[in-house]
């Protein structure tokens, strides 16, 4: 997207925009990623009036929803889009047709905006590190598992294996019976385009994307 000049916005009766995050708490880019990294239990989305300042217009309609423990940034984004379409059909269109725009009062107690300058705050540049806890690694995987269109190296969960950086596509616990090739005293190994990890007496499979960096 891009910033639209105010003189252009003034030519439109109701310039509106959809934002896939709750405003003003999660303005800017990749709101679902930051919400997961910050251990949020809920997220949201909204339609708002547009101004020359990004994500700062009055709220027309909003929806909050739960972030499940298994949700990734991608599935949170999907929920936002589904609720966004529902709000457009049930609220936004009706207000436009009736020429009766009502705004909702914003909660300005927490205002934050995440831009490109914040990308450096992604833990370990998105590299999983199994010297750290399983909870840490799974959260990082979930937060960086976005849609296929977002292919930036930074915004993908990754793992380093024998001096190669590889993007992780899936992260699942598996049965110990399915592991036949683990060497003794080793907690991580590679087999058939997957990294296998032994952690806290459990086994996990990290399926890799074919693209290597």
Q: Where are each of the predicted segments found?
A:
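Donor/substrate-binding cores of folate-linked one-carbon enzymes
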Residues: 1-115
């Amino acid at each position: 997207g891009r910033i639209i000049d105010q003189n252009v916005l003034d030519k439109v009766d109701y310039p509106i925009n959809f934002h896939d995050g709750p405003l003003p708490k999660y303005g800017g880019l990749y709101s679902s990623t930051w919400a997961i990294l910050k251990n949020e239990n809920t997220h949201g989305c909204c339609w708002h009036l547009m101004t020359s300042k990004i994500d700062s217009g009055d709220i027309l309609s909003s929806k909050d929803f739960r972030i499940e423990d298994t949700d990734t940034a991608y599935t949170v984004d999907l929920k936002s889009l589904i609720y966004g379409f529902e709000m457009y059909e049930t609220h936004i269109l009706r207000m436009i047709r009736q020429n009766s725009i009502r705004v909702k009062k914003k909660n300005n107690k927490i205002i934050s905006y995440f831009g490109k300058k914040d990308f450096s705050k992604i833990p370990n540049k998105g590299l999983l590190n199994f010297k750290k806890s399983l909870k840490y690694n799974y959260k990082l995987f979930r937060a960086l598992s976005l849609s296929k269109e977002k292919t930036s190296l930074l915004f993908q969960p990754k793992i380093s294996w024998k001096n190669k950086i590889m993007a992780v596509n899936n992260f699942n616990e598996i049965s110990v019976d399915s592991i036949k090739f683990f060497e003794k005293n080793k907690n991580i190994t590679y087999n058939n385009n997957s990294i296998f990890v032994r952690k806290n007496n459990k086994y996990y499979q990290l399926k890799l994307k074919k693209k290597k960096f």
